[in-house]
Amino acid sequence: MRYEPVIGLELHIQLNTHSKLFSPSSAAFGAEANTHVNEIDLAYPGVLPVLNEQALASAVLFGLALGSRIHSSAVFMRKNYFYPDSPKGYQISQLNDAVILGGQVSIDVDGATQTVRINRGQLEEDAGKSVHDIFSDRTGIDLNRAGVPLIELVSEPDMHSAAAAVAYMRKIHHLVRYLGISDGNMQEGSFRCDANVSIRPVGSKELNARVELKNINSFRFVAQAIQIEIERQSDILDAGGSVEQETRLFDPEKMQTRTMRSKENANDYRYFPDPDLLPLHLSAETIEHIRAQLPELPDARAQRYRKDYQLDDETIAFLVQTRMIADYFDAVVAKCHDAKLAANWISVELARLLNEHHLSFEQNPVSAEQFSQLLLKIHDDTISAQNGKKVLDYLWQHADADVDAVIDTQGLRQISDDQALKTWAAEVLAAYPKQVADYRGGQEKLLGFFVGQVMKKSRGKANPKTVNDIISQMLQAE
């Protein structure tokens, strides 16, 4: 029998605030175990949580970017469970009255556009970590992560393949990094995924028992885990069995999923409103103030670049991968007025230098002002593209350098004086009579050879386009 997978994802997105969600302890990653904790994180009697306003603002910004409804009276709930890395015995989370309600994103899968609906995005605190590799006979507990702010983004079960799930996950990962609300570092646990997977006969609309795949920490593992789970469930149904609702772990070494525990329902967690935290009161003015901070989003920017500048998809993908790159590109285009030239030089030449020096775009030492001035000099033929690379290399090493001064001190200004170029061209044609005869005999590719010889005479300073025109005219005239 043929089956259709039904997949929903729960993405756990750590917010990059300085402090935790309900305490002033540092939320920074990588400190010595149990050094970023205080009385609130340790659940001392009598302490009270205080909401981190920046975390709330980040959640609202994210919801607006998703086209969600912002719940102005969202409620914090206690999710009760016993686990050693949660000192309180409960997690402060949200449920149906979450701050982010609804919304959707578009994804591209195998050349087709699909829509994935958002169920909700809940603002909650992260748990601590159980550490198994320090002690031989015990498990350690590190509470540095306990209380770090998270958004748990719950999708509707709108995905029907591992490829669609990964495309959705990548889309959200890109968005949170673009907005600057999370670093999305999967190795450090800043972006984690739980996948809910079920299957049903093709054509059926009934939702069957789902299996939750827990804490998958890479795009590749998400694809593998979902595909393996789809095959496992298919084998069970083909053998006449039934799939049990449970939580399973993915083992990437054995390429299999294994039972972790039976899957809990909401009632098992005994949710109730946290009595220490009043419902939120987000005014319309507050929401609009945050909306005003929303940048032009990646999809809108990509559409504009495609429509206004006719850029190709690969170049657009490079430009919108971060907000900083897109802002830089827009600033350069505003001054040099040549979008295709700017896009090419940013995505090729500037990217080359960043890669060679193992730097991110945030560490780019060349200002948009310098870069636009460089492109203006290339655009108006003051310098050749080849010498433009030399200027860029110099700017990379000298952050305060002036483009005009670099061109003059390095002697890179192009020679466009017709008389000088005609003299060199005549000398070249006189020096290569055989090649001239061959050209006139039909070997027109030799034109590039003649241009190259003039460029040598000028030490690379001649304007190659002008040289090309002059030599063509000379060859036709004679």
Curated annotation (Swiss-Prot):
EC number(s) reported in the record: 6.3.5.-
Listed Pfam families: GatB_N, GatB_Yqey
PROSITE patterns documented for this protein: GATB
Protein origin, superkingdom: Bacteria
Gene Ontology molecular function terms on file: asparaginyl-tRNA synthase (glutamine-hydrolyzing) activity; ATP binding; glutaminyl-tRNA synthase (glutamine-hydrolyzing) activity
Biological processes per GO annotation: glutaminyl-tRNAGln biosynthesis via transamidation; translation
Keywords of the record: ATP-binding, Ligase, Nucleotide-binding, Protein biosynthesis
UniProt keyword Membrane, yes or no: no
ATP-binding is among the record's keywords: yes
Subunit structure comment from the entry: Heterotrimer of A, B and C subunits.
Primary role: Allows the formation of correctly charged Asn-tRNA(Asn) or Gln-tRNA(Gln) through the transamidation of misacylated Asp-tRNA(Asn) or Glu-tRNA(Gln) in organisms which lack either or both of asparaginyl-tRNA or glutaminyl-tRNA synthetases. The reaction takes place in the presence of glutamine and ATP through an activated phospho-Asp-tRNA(Asn) or phospho-Glu-tRNA(Gln).
PANTHER family for the chain: GLUTAMYL-TRNA GLN AMIDOTRANSFERASE SUBUNIT B MITOCHONDRIAL AND PROKARYOTIC PET112-RELATED, GLUTAMYL-TRNA(GLN) AMIDOTRANSFERASE SUBUNIT B, MITOCHONDRIAL
NCBIfam families to which the protein is assigned, alphabetical: gatB, PRK05477.1-2, PRK05477.1-4
Protein name stated in the entry: Aspartyl/glutamyl-tRNA(Asn/Gln) amidotransferase subunit B
